[in-house]
Amino acid sequence: MTETAGSLGLPLDMPPHVYIVIAVTILCVRVLHVALAPPPRRPMDGPPLRTMVVLGSGGHTAEMFALLRAMSPRRYAPRHYVIADTDTTSRVKAEHHEAAVGESLAESSDVDDDELSIASEYSVGTIPRAREVGQGWIHSFFTTVRAAVHAAAVVFRERPHVLLCNGPGTCVPVVAWAFVARTLRPVTWFVGVGSRPAIVYVESAARTKTMSLTGRILYTTRLADEVFVQWEGLARRYPRAKFAGRVC
């Protein structure tokens, strides 16, 4: 009579490759479940949501801060900004934005000291660029791996409830690891690093006819829960994308 493995009823003498096939099948089902499931929904009157914001440069940064100014700092707090390690401009802009947020909250009569402390909290972290302009493809492989390792550390350390990005290539490894964090949540929850971030991507207003490479990657792979575009024509071309007006 064949001996079985616990309550699963699997024979203990099965070849190792069978267990591998079973494990891979379970993982694939889990990935599909996460990719096709609706984004996490949280009540609007719930506790503050840890928010991670990936900043690019130039127009991307300007659009992101326009978007952040429309969001409640009391609801989306604390905020952790992720920038490329060679991007000093975005760090300065983040600090200026947060200084303005702090002043506005301090002047508000309905914000107590505890709420002010939480809503004003922010931090800035860096990750290496996955690829510099003009960099060769072979060298890019190693820099991409390095960026992915740093992105994983950021995501599992900060455990965001919301991940917000709008186009820079820097966001791809961060989004990928946020998706991994959701996929592995049944496991990571037990060791205290689990999170279930809602991943939101906002395409740049500069993209009027087609999505950027980053946008196409996140849209096609379904790594992003919500994809917003700023032109109605783009929403018609990409049916799962949503048009909600322009940021600025």
How would you label these PLM feature ranges?
Residues 1-248:
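Nucleotide-activated sugar donor-binding and catalytic core shared by glycosyltransferases
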